[in-house]
């Protein structure tokens, strides 16, 4: 009798222990689900309200915006973890960042509209002052058969190589400082554009403006190379770039020609608020990511093509050259 009672007591104790263990595991799974859901909501907040992230400390907002599309990978990682945890809470919460990312960047994946009768093709490329293969670089650029080619970091003797290699297809050209423009159409009104920040004291010429005489009317073309940014322990160092972008924006705003095309290494992505003086005044590509830097493993597009009174079609990267940037090409539909 005593033996039976002891067995019954042990059995009940085992049942209570197993129940407590199952309850503990359930709580742990639910807790992990809420943690994943919290990260999902945070990611959605960064995507939708990235402009609210302050720039006062280390330009944190600009740093986030430079890599904003890559938050899509965070969404994918959270989705995998939520599926492994079988957390309905996390999966539901992930709808928020998924919708946010799609609204911001989903359109870039859509196909390009058909070419119109008043289109131009333009190429933008920072050829790098350390480029050891200017001949091969010129070959890649010429193969795009663009109407305009904008180049930055032009230094002798490489500049002469580009001039000679591109001359057969591009008889019109201008080089101002370290930036240049090659064109199939005549150029007029060529002049440098002063976009030098006040803190730079040495000789520094990185902007030009020219009027392109196309069969469809005159177009003001701007070529620019904004100062580089650096990521330090204190954050993103971009004050010179931001100042230069402001000067370039003022020049574009004062341009008398109705139609304007801007091509340049702007050392900034389009989402970065540092380019607001330009993106607020000009149209940008709505199709294509075209990450252009670094060429070995592109993670951001800092080479930009913009237009006023014209539409920028799909932007795409060309084959790698001897530069640390990839060339980008886009079709411009004139209005």
Regions found by a protein language model. Give the residues of each.
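Soluble catalytic domains of enzymes that build or remodel membrane lipids, polysaccharides, and related
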Residues: 118, 131-142, 153-335
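N-terminal, active-site-proximal structural segment of metallo-dependent hydrolase catalytic domains
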Residues: 2-163
């Amino acid at each position: 009798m005593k033996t039976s009672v002891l067995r019954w007591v042990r059995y009940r104790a085992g049942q209570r222990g197993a129940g407590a263990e199952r309850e503990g595991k359930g709580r742990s799974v639910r807790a992990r689900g809420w943690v994943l859901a919290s990260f999902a909501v945070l990611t959605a907040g960064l995507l939708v309200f990235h402009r609210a992230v302050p720039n006062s400390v280390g330009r944190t907002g600009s740093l986030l915006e430079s890599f904003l599309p890559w938050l899509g990978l965070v969404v994918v990682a959270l989705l995998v973890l939520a599926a492994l945890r079988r957390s309905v809470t996390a999966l539901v919460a992930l709808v928020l960042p998924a919708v946010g990312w799609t609204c911001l960047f989903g359109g870039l994946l859509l196909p390009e509209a058909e070419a119109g009768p008043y289109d131009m093709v333009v190429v933008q490329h920072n050829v790098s002052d350390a480029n050891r293969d200017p001949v091969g670089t010129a070959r890649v650029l010429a193969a795009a058969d663009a109407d305009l080619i904008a180049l930055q970091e032009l230094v002798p003797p490489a500049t002469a190589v580009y001039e000679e290699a591109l001359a057969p297809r591009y008889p019109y050209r201008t080089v101002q400082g370290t930036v240049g423009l090659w064109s199939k159409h005549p150029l007029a009104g060529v002049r440098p554009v002063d976009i030098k920040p006040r803190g730079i004291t040495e000789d520094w010429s990185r902007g030009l403006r020219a009027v392109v005489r196309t069969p469809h009317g005159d177009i003001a073309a701007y070529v620019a190379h904004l100062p580089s940014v650096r990521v330090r322990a204190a954050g993103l160092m971009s004050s010179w770039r931001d100042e230069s972008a402001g000067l370039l924006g003022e020049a574009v705003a004062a341009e008398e020609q109705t139609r304007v095309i801007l091509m340049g290494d702007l050392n900034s992505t389009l989402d970065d608020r540092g380019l607001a003086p330009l993106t607020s005044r000009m149209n940008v590509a709505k199709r294509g990511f075209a990450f252009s830097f670094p060429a070995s493993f592109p993670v951001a597009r800092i080479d930009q093509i913009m237009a006023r009174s014209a539409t920028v079609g799909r932007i795409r990267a060309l084959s790698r050259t001897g530069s640390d940037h990839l060339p980008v090409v886009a079709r411009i539909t004139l209005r």
